Amino acid sequence: MRQPFEEYKGKFSSKTRSTLNRKIRKYTEHCGGSISWKLYKSAGEMPEFFQLARTVSQVTYQEKLLDAGLPDSEEFRREMDQLAQQGHVRGFILFYQDIPVSYLYCPVVNDVLIYAFLGYNPSYMNFSVGTVLQWLALEHLFAERCFRFFDFTEGQSEHKKLFATHHIQCANVFFLRSNLRNRLLLHSQRIVDNFSKLTGDKLDQLGLKSKVKKMMRFGI
């Protein structure tokens, strides 16, 4: 992340850059001509970030379906405060007027930003507020010139594929005893994985995958 932001933008095709610019322009117009967002990084700023981010997190599919929202615990708040005192955290909030609509929380480990918690209010989904905030945050972080990488962590998503520049293979490895029970479990897991992949591929071919995802996440 110590290269200029303009150089990073060069990794996108002209079509993708046009799409991103269109999304930002659409949200700018929705906001009346200018986008309101805020960076949080000091210990004095993080309580405000936490309050606003929790307002968003509690309505996200990450929290409702995956139990992966911004933790609402004293332990997390203490950890966040400690990181802020050391300068090892960045938080971002995107607003519509004075309403928080998306958030991004990134602790810093060895000069690497970790894509830890994020979410957006589904009521603003049509304005791509998650993508807009990610773009604005990256632009700012490149300008800071303080970090080596932005780690999108493990897992696959279109969002990560869009913004990442590199990837590495990673896996969770389990050692199991060779017995009938474990073999049946592994076989069942393969069946489920294959069915999921085949279903996803078929929905993708039919142009229905994104619609089904929205139905599962947001009930629409």
Protein language model regions, located:
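A general structural signal for short secondary-structure boundary/capping elements
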Residues: 19, 42, 84-87, 140, ...
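Glycine-rich loops and low-complexity Gly/Arg-rich segments
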Residues: 19-25, 61-65, 118, 129-131, ...
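Active-site/acyl-donor-binding loops of N-acyltransferases
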Residues: 1-6, 148-207, 212
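A conserved beta-strand-loop-helix scaffold within acyl/acetyltransferase catalytic domains
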Residues: 2-126, 218-219
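Acyl-donor binding region in acyl/amide transferases
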Residues: 110-169, 174-175
